[in-house]
A protein has these predicted regions:
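Short hydrophobic targeting helices and cationic amphipathic motifs
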Residues: 1, 9-13, 17, 23-25, ...
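N-terminal charged helix/coil linker that caps or initiates catalytic domains
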Residues: 44, 49-76, 110
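Glycine-rich phosphate/adenylate-binding loop
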Residues: 50, 161-167, 172-177, 187, ...
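Hydrophobic/small residue at the entry helix of a nucleotide-binding pocket
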Residues: 84
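Conserved S-adenosyl-L-methionine
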Residues: 94-99
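Glycine-rich phosphate-binding loop and adjoining beta1-alpha1-beta2 segment
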Residues: 104-139
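Conserved SAM/SAH-binding loop
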Residues: 149-156
């Protein structure tokens, strides 16, 4: 369009002004037209890209519009959309984050219905990532959402981390892919908060946010620490964990599907609280609050 304006000037107006102005002035006018037009277009693009935050008026009232708008410019990745990750992803979306990546290759199983946000009696066998995609976009239609319907593997993780997320929530509940992800995230120096075990426990008031090296009374965290040490990683990963004594009788051996050889019993609310705490770490850190 800018060049069309210039052509109009050249074909119709310039002949009449040929005797009055020189070539230098002609090109100066060309440049002025293009510069002004591009400036207007850039301004319109910025206006169009700015997320509508009117639905976040209660959040703005709490943290202020400036910090809220800063959240709309952030990219948060949630890996694992089970009992912890599904709730964490929803809380992140409801905070006004502008861009998200969600990753999970699993489908809904009937046993998920006691604790997982996507799981209903009507959607057994459906991709958790697909269900969460529809839900998050229904919460915020302007959300830039990248959906990865895959289980964690090194190549995929490297690719996703290359997109420079501002924060990552690790809600993977199987040890091998969890260690794969944490190792690569640690090496890439991306900010991570990782969920430890929500199984075999009942008390949501016991949850803490600490460095991985400070965890105790959590069999899952113990295994994570042990496997990370094999990669020379002993500290430097922020985690959500519960020091509540685990109910060991709730342990169940499994068939090893999806890298899980065992599982603990779970209660409906506790994984959601883990997800809420993880989401709170991300949001508070991104707006400059002390964790």
């Amino acid at each position: 369009l800018a060049h069309g304006i210039v052509f109009y000037f050249d074909d119709f107006l310039f002949p009449y002004l040929r005797s009055a102005i020189g070539l230098n002035l002609k090109f100066a006018i060309y440049n002025l037209i293009i510069f002004k037009f591009c400036s207007v277009v850039s301004l319109l693009e910025i206006i169009n890209m700015e997320m509508d935050i009117s639905w976040l008026s209660r959040t703005s009232l709490l943290i202020g519009e400036e910090r809220l708008r800063s959240l709309t410019q952030k990219h948060v990745m949630v890996v694992g959309l089970g009992g912890v990750g599904s709730f964490a992803a929803e809380f992140i979306a409801r905070s006004g984050i502008g861009k998200m990546t969600i990753i999970d290759g699993d489908v809904v199983d009937p046993t998920n219905r006691n604790r997982q946000l996507p799981a209903l009696a009507t959607n057994h066998g459906v991709s958790k990532a697909l269900i969460m995609e529809e839900r998050l976009k229904a919460i915020n239609p302007e959300l830039q959402l990248n959906v990865v319907k895959e289980f964690v593997n090194p190549e995929m993780v490297k690719q996703q981390l290359s997109y420079d997320p501002d924060y990552v929530i690790d809600a993977i509940d199987s040890l091998t892919p969890k260690i794969t992800f944490l190792k690569l995230a640690y090496e890439s120096k991306v900010k991570v908060v990782s969920s430890m075990g929500a199984g075999a426990k009942l008390d949501p008031t016991k949850l803490q946010v600490v460095d991985i090296s400070k965890t105790f009374n959590c069999p899952f965290a113990q295994q994570v620490r042990k496997m990370l040490k094999q990669h020379e990683i002993r500290k430097g990963i922020k985690v959500v964990f519960s020091p509540e004594n685990p109910i060991k009788e709730s342990l169940m051996l499994t068939d090893g599907k999806n890298f899980k050889k065992s599982a603990y019993g779970t209660i409906s609310y506790l994984p959601a609280v883990f997800g809420a705490v993880a989401a709170s770490v991300v949001i508070r850190d991104l707006i400059g609050e002390k964790i």
